Curated annotation (Swiss-Prot):
GO terms for cellular component: Golgi cisterna membrane. Keywords: Glycoprotein, Glycosyltransferase, Golgi apparatus, Lipid metabolism, Membrane, Signal-anchor, Transferase, Transmembrane, Transmembrane helix. Glycans are attached at N65, N301, N327. This is Galactoside alpha-(1,2)-fucosyltransferase 1. It comes from Bos taurus. The keyword Glycoprotein applies. Belongs to the glycosyltransferase 11 family.
Length: 360
C-alpha cells in the first residue's frame, strides 16, 4: 500500500488551506454584498403579558401595544426618560402628562415606573411603556427636579438617561398636546359607562325632572385643612365660595344640577345649600379608590373645583366652563415660590377670590 511521504502531507495541507480561504471569501462576499442583513429577533409578542418596554437585541425600542416586527437595520436608541412617581392620583396624572410632553419635545423615549402604572392603568388607557425594575436599578440616571411651570431650558435637555422629579401639573407643559393627553387619560369603558348610568339616573330631588346640564363639584378637604393654614398661609374652599360658584352657573345655564364629590362628604352635606333642590351628593369620599368620583366628574359638562390636582384634572378632562378658587394664600406665602396661578389654571377658566379673613 502506498503511504504518503512528509512532502505529500505538506502539499495536501496547503491545498486544503487554499480551498478553505477561497470558500470563506465566496461565502463572505455572498452574505455581505447581496443585500442580506443579519439581525436578532424580538421576543415573541404573544408572551408579552403587560405593557412593558421591549428592546430588540439590535438596540431598537419596540412598542408592545402595537403590531411590530424588528427592523432589519439597527437604529440608535433615542434615550430613556422616566419620572419619580410621588403623591396621589392627581399628582401622578400631572407627572405622567409632563413626562410624555417633555420626552416628545426632546426626542426621547418615555417610560413610567411600575408604581405609577399601578395607580393610573386601572382607570385610564395609558400607553407609555413600563420601565423594568432591573433597568431602573442599573441605569446611569441623571436627575432633574422640575418646577411647576414650563421653562425654555426644559426644551433643550441633552441627557439620554434622565429621571425627572417634582410635582409638575401645569398646563404649560402639555396643553399643546391636549388631544393626546385626553386620549391617554381616556377612561376604561366600564368606568365611563358606570358614570354615565349614574348621571342619567339623577333627577331633581323636588320635581323629579331630568337635568340637562351637569356641573361636577370637587371639594378638597382632608389633609389640606391643616396643611393650607399652618404651612402655606392659605385656605380651602368654604361655604361662601361654593355658593358663589353655584350661583355663577345658575345665572348662565338653565336648570343645572350639581354633582358633589369630596374627601369630606360629611362637611359638604352640612354646609352646601340644598334649598333649591339642585344638589346631589354623589361622591363616596374614598381617597384610596378615586375611580368612581373621578369618572363622575369627567363625565359632567362643567366643573367647580376648589384646590388640588384632582380637581384640576377633572376640569381639564371634562371641558366646559370651570370655576376655581383664586388667591387662596396670603401674598407673603412661600407657596407662591413654587406655584404660579397663571401656569396652574387655564386662561379661560374663571376664578373667584377666596376669603382670607380666617388667616388674619
Amino acid at each position: 500500500m502506498w503511504a504518503p511521504g512528509h512532502h505529500h502531507l505538506c502539499l495536501i495541507f496547503l491545498l486544503t488551506c487554499v480551498f478553505a480561504c477561497v470558500f470563506f471569501l465566496l461565502i463572505h462576499q455572498n452574505l455581505f454584498h447581496s443585500g442580506l442583513d443579519l439581525f436578532l429577533p424580538c421576543p415573541d409578542r404573544s408572551r408579552v403579558r403587560s405593557p412593558v418596554a421591549i428592546l430588540c437585541l439590535s438596540g431598537t425600542l419596540m412598542n408592545p401595544n402595537a403590531t411590530f416586527t424588528c427592523p432589519r437595520h439597527s437604529a440608535s436608541v433615542s434615550g430613556t426618560w422616566t419620572i419619580d412617581p410621588k403623591g396621589r392620583f392627581g399628582n401622578q396624572m400631572g407627572q405622567y402628562a409632563t413626562l410624555l410632553a417633555l420626552a416628545q419635545l426632546n426626542g426621547r423615549q418615555a417610560f413610567i415606573q411600575p408604581s405609577m402604572h399601578a395607580v393610573l392603568a386601572p382607570v385610564f388607557r395609558i400607553t407609555l411603556p413600563v420601565l423594568a425594575p432591573e433597568v431602573d436599578r442599573h441605569a446611569p440616571w441623571q436627575e432633574l427636579e422640575l418646577h411647576d411651570w414650563m421653562s425654555e431650558e426644559y426644551a433643550h435637555l441633552k441627557e439620554p438617561w434622565l429621571k425627572l422629579t417634582g410635582f409638575p401639573c401645569s398646563w404649560t407643559f402639555f396643553h399643546h398636546l391636549r388631544d393626546q393627553i385626553r386620549s391617554e387619560f381616556t377612561l376604561h369603558e366600564h368606568l365611563r359607562q358606570e358614570a354615565q348610568r349614574s348621571l342619567s339616573g339623577l333627577r331633581f330631588p323636588r320635581t323629579g325632572g331630568r337635568p340637562s346640564t351637569f356641573v361636577g363639584v370637587h371639594v378638597r378637604r382632608g389633609d389640606y385643612l391643616q396643611v393650607m393654614p399652618l404651612h402655606w398661609k392659605g385656605v380651602v374652599g368654604d361655604r361662601a365660595y361654593l355658593q358663589q360658584a353655584m350661583d355663577w352657573f345658575r345665572a348662565r345655564h338653565k336648570a343645572p344640577i350639581f354633582v358633589v364629590t369630596s374627601n369630606g362628604m360629611k362637611w359638604c352635606r352640612e354646609n352646601i345649600d340644598t334649598s333649591r333642590g339642585d344638589v346631589i351628593f354623589a361622591g363616596d369620599g374614598q381617597e384610596g379608590a378615586p375611580n368612581k368620583d373621578f369618572a363622575l366628574l369627567t363625565q359632567c359638562n362643567h366643573t367647580i373645583m376648589t384646590i388640588g390636582t384632582f380637581g384640576f384634572w377633572a376640569a381639564y378632562l371634562a371641558g366646559g366652563d370651570t370655576i376655581y378658587l383664586a388667591n387662596f394664600t396670603l401674598p407673603d406665602s412661600s407657596f407662591l415660590k413654587i406655584f404660579k396661578p397663571e401656569a396652574a389654571f387655564l386662561p379661560e377658566w374663571v376664578g373667584i377670590n377666596a376669603d382670607l379673613s380666617p388667616l388674619q
